[in-house]
Amino acid sequence: MVVGYGGRKIIMKNDDTSYYGRILIKALAKNYPDNYYILYSPENESNKRLTALFNEDSVRVKFPRSHIHNKNHWYTGNGIVRSAKGHGVNTFHGIDDGIASGFSGSNFPTVFTMTDPLYRNADGWVERMLMQRRARKACKIAKRVIALNEVDRQTIIDHYHVKPDDVEVVHPCYFDGCDESVPENMFEILREKYHLPERFVLYKGRLDKNDNLTEAMQLVHALRNNKISIVMLGYRTNHFDRVIKEEVHNIHMFHRFKQVDKIHLADLTAVCKMAKAVIIPNTDRARDLYKIINAQRSGAVVICKDSAKAREIGGDGAIYFDDIHKGADMLSDVLEDENKKAALLEAARANTERFTAKVLADHMIHIYRSVLTHRRLYQE
């Protein structure tokens, strides 16, 4: 089988779409290496995160030929369709970025995934409107539409008027580095390297308004053990400088607060294991669901904002909070009782078996084969 992907955002961006595309294609390449996976993009962009993916023998990248002047038109029109057919592509998979209009009416097997069905993380309302318009067209073209969770599935059905039988949930998988073992002496080395406190709760992500960082700080501040700090891993933003730093002063957390710009990817699993817990104060976006899965697989206690999405992904292996003080009490109970902590971590580990690369690859290959079968039946 040869699968083509709309790879513009995967190659040129470092966002939720790019991350999902990388882990999906990596999972497929590892578990079904006899297939070929071709990423199509109008332009090339240096992206270090793609190095491991491009090292897979079954992964290829294709761009429009040099004589084609309007490369974006090639990507969104008939050009990419001709290229895909010429490369023997059996199924085309668009991820967030729409599906080329040239596939419309062709009965070409197509699949479309939306990591954020309403595109709330788009850069402004104009970009959001354009992305929703592309998604609406893609839903009409695609033979199967993929959501990452049941809430998003219902949103796709309601907002884009897609038939329920045509929308399927395919959960993402955890990052394969989460399974790496960490030598005991590495913890102290990393503590000195990144100047980390002895006991801390870790937040990893963007330091923006929508991340509910004040709630994260207030929850850590309310813990019964006042020697536990919060470490925020992410680059400083205007919101951080104007709001977060002021909140640190307001609740007197100067000595219990640490911000780190960047931790090397190879060190991230170890830092998660060092943390008393990983806190995820917003669970409404794809990136937050990735965090839950990765933190659980890394062996960290996970506490996250309560939501239907969070409970679907986190299962029995996480602490869910709506109220800051109740959340602090629940986390304190777990951290103070080794039996409760061990039971939670065991449940988290068992929960992540739903999110292995093999499970993701098997599910997606089943979908690719089903749309291919649908095409053959239609032709007969």
Residue locations for each model-derived region?
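Carbohydrate transferase catalytic cores enriched for Leloir-type hexosyltransferases
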Residues: 1-380
